[in-house]
Amino acid sequence: MGRTRVVERDVAVVLSGGAVNGVLMELGFLQRLRASALWPRVGWIYGTSSGALSGTMAALDRLDELEEFMLQLQPEETFRPHSLWRLPLLGSHDYRLPETVADRLGDIAGLARLLAEAPIEMTVVATDVSDDEHGAGQHAYELVYSSRTTPPETMAQAILASAAISALVLPRRVGDRIATDGAWVRNFPLAHAYEQPGVELIVSFRYLPRYPRIGTEGLQRLRRRLERFPKLPPIRALINELRDAEERGARGEPAHWPDMIVRLMRVAIQQNTVLEERVARDKDEALRALEALRGDVDAIIRSEGGRRGARVARAVEERFASASFPFLGDRAIPRIAVQSTAGEVSLETGLRNPTPWTEEAKRELIRRGYDLLDDLLAEEAVA
């Protein structure tokens, strides 16, 4: 009888945030990856926000359950709008996703316990908003949780905190920290995959969001309802404030604080995501250029021949070996990278009265993620 060949796990998967669009497209992306020859080689998944949820189910090899869950999911089962009077104290939405996950997929802590035993290590990123001081280092305000080293209960809290869109809901407790959506600090955790010594290939999905403009229609409806009571001084003052907000919106300015929070989050997410890819790309190019330079210098010196040439070549080689710079121990890692918007189909959680999510639209987004990776795998001749 022949021996069973053990496949080395040397592939990392990186998943960005992206709300419901991101989960659905990542689901298709992961389904195609699972059907490929690369899947048995996957040893690590790194996910932020929506990528934390889809990555967790992929690491557990429960993508079919995730698909069923997502096809049933509706906006009010993720983030349910609060009454207007509760906004100043509780945020714009109630975070319903934890209860929905527990009802349909099982206790999240139970999933985290299974995750600790899974052959694929899952790592999620959350943003630390605890009320204490942080250092000014590279990972300030970033919380990173691995299924290999984090207690299951804390890991469960981290997955839900990473997916808690802070423009909508209040932060959550993760162990002894207060945390929220990881997209604020690292929406696309590519650097963590590069830092894993065993990784020889990275397969990544980055969702490119199109942020819908937050209008003032809700404010207009509220103002018209209040205008039936114009003689009451507090109501009259509120009507004037609403008119001012509508005018700000008409000028392209933030009409209210949720609009401001969304705009700030858009800036933070776009900036840290682009920077993440730029640093990875520049590092790979620098490492390749350095290796080429090393070879060229060695060839030039050795072309002189003789003992002197050999002596100088050894001295130069020793100098290269003793050089010290930030990414000396790093190496260029090939990457199969999918980037995409939701296309013509986009499902978002609006601030008020969101439109129901249709199964047809969801299946289209799943197909889009599947087909995008399928095209790239074909180009790379990966079965």
Regions found by a protein language model. Give the residues of each.
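Patatin-like phospholipase
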Residues: 1-46, 56-383
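Catalytic nucleophile serine of serine hydrolases
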Residues: 49
